[in-house]
A protein has these predicted regions:
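N-terminal Rossmann-like FAD-binding beta1-loop-alpha1 element of flavoenzymes
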Residues: 155-175
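Ferredoxin-type iron-sulfur electron-transfer modules and their immediate structural context
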Residues: 1-156
Length: 175
């Protein structure tokens, strides 16, 4: 699967943040927007830093990803340039990675084994950035498309809440 020494060969590269003076005046993203195809090369390398640990705490619901995203799996697929398969693995556990990947505080990166000894390892894998790129590229390349309900049953369901959990519940009831 992954190169277990990739983190030793490839330095961690963080996404560029917008200047603070600019960010305090709006509600836009903290990070600079960049075309996913432009950042794909960087993200391929960063995914190669994942060492596919024996016990990947990054996707454990107690310490890492609360959704249980299959992070080592899609990191390896991205590393090999298999964006369509990476998107499939990401969507297997996450209905809306295109916005959860931006809103999430990324406990997966804190739980990453490489974050334990940051000075020696260079820090955690940039999981959040990789997830954003998978989702963005999937939309731009037509791998993911809007999915309207196949048929209308005529029934109505009320979902309280417009956050990610409410939207995921509504999405599962619509299909």
């Amino acid at each position: 699967m992954a190169d277990p020494t990739g983190f030793l060969k490839i330095p961690k590269v963080e996404a560029a943040k917008r200047p603070v003076d600019e960010r305090v005046g709006d509600w836009r993203e903290v990070y600079e927007r960049q075309d996913p195809h432009e950042r794909a090369g960087e993200v391929l390398q960063q995914a190669g830093r994942c060492m596919d640990c024996g016990i990947p705490f990054c996707h454990s619901g107690t310490a890492g990803c609360p959704l249980g995203n299959l992070i080592p799996e899609w990191n390896d697929l991205v590393r090999r340039g298999r964006w369509d398969a990476a998107s499939d693995r990401l969507h297997a556990t996450n209905n809306f990675p295109e916005f959860t990947g931006r809103l999430c505080p990324a406990p997966c990166e804190v739980a990453c084994v490489l974050s334990i000894a940051e000075e020696q390892t260079g820090g955690s894998v940039t999981i959040k950035r990789i997830e954003q790129t998978i989702a963005d590229q999937a939309w731009m390349d037509g791998i993911v498309e809007p999915q309207p309900a196949a048929i209308s049953t005529g029934k109505r369901v009320a979902v309280v809440g417009s956050g990610p959990a409410g939207l995921a519940a509504a999405n599962s009831k619509a299909g």
